[in-house]
Every structure is written in C-alpha cells, then in structure tokens.
C-alpha cells in the first residue's frame, strides 16, 4: 500500500491508471512519486499525456488483453504507451469516450456507462476480450469513477444498491462491496490506483478505509495465501 497525491490532490485515480503490465501517469509527475508507485504496483511506468491532458486515469483503462483510451489520443501518445505495454492501445469511439471514467473492467468482464453506443460496447468487447454490460452505480453513470476493480474484487460507491452490486459481481465474476476513500469520498475509482499485487491510494485515506479496500479488493487474501 502507498499513500500518494498529485500536485496536492489525493484523487490519484484521476491522474494515473494501472493495467496488468503498465502504469500510466500524468507527464509532470515527479520522479520519486513515479518510482514509488511503480514499485508498489510492480509494473513499469509511462509518464504521458492522453489527448494532451494530464488526467490519464480518467481517459484510459485496460486489462490483460488491451488498453482503451479516449479518441482524442495522439499517435505519439499511443506509441509511447505501446512501447512499454505488451498489448495494443485502442481508441474508444463516440462522444462518451473518457475510457477510465466510463468503463469498470478486470480480466473477466466490463461494466460500462449506460449510454455508450453499440459501436463503443463492441469496441470494448474486442479490445479487452471480455463480455460487457451497461449500467449505473448509485445513480452515477461514470461507473469508472464510482468503483475500482481487480481480479479478486470490486470496491463500489457507498450508496450502491444491492441489484447493482449483484450485476457487477455477475459481469466481473468477483465479489463486490462498498466503501469510501480520502476520508469519506464516495467516488472510490477516483481515489485508488489498483494493481494485481498492490495499490496506491489518496493520501487522505483513513485506516478503516484501507482495511475495507484491502479486504474487498483481495489484498488481504493475497497476503494470507503467501
């Protein structure tokens, strides 16, 4: 576990995104933070913009099969990511294309913004090679901000309803539970960068919140199994 911030903001999930084999970070991150995050997540880091923006966590997501980014990405940015990642980078089509905000995914499935077009859903299915379902989470359409997923669990907005949790469990094939980050903030996807072996959380996150995060996302299980 690593507590961190970007330019004083504890919403680390807005500015960084971890897939199975690469950590994407905003381009102006300091070297110490980049190195610490890469070490915690045990994956190489790429400091970059996406579409000229530093909000790379909001604009990108991925799993073991591929990475999805906003269609505003430049060729130079795509090449920078693909140089380090072992998978291809695909642009999410349509007007709702902040991939990190609108897609919640792991290696088993994806749960996405309810208004994504059929073309966008098909693009996600192809890029990530998983089944896709549309839905909301606690009335939040940007489901990637309202939850964070690993291959062991999904931590969701504290006002998520039971049918929503069940839908996420069905489509991502892991247990889902509720929690908060950064001393009570409900948009947990904006405050956590979750990898398969470790995670980075906003610096304002409390001890009880950390316990819920580690239990729900499977880090306690991982430690026990070791």
From Swiss-Prot:
Function as written in the Swiss-Prot or TrEMBL entry: Binds to the 50S ribosomal subunit and prevents its association with the 30S ribosomal subunit to form the 70S initiation complex.
Keyword Protein biosynthesis: yes
Protein name as catalogued: Translation initiation factor 6
Annotated coiled-coil segments of the chain: none
Family: Belongs to the eIF-6 family.
GO molecular function ontology, one term from the record: translation initiation factor activity
UniProt entry tagged with the keyword Membrane: no
Keyword line: Initiation factor, Protein biosynthesis
Pfam families: eIF-6 (PF01912)
One of the GO BP terms on file: cytosolic ribosome assembly
InterPro entries: eIF6
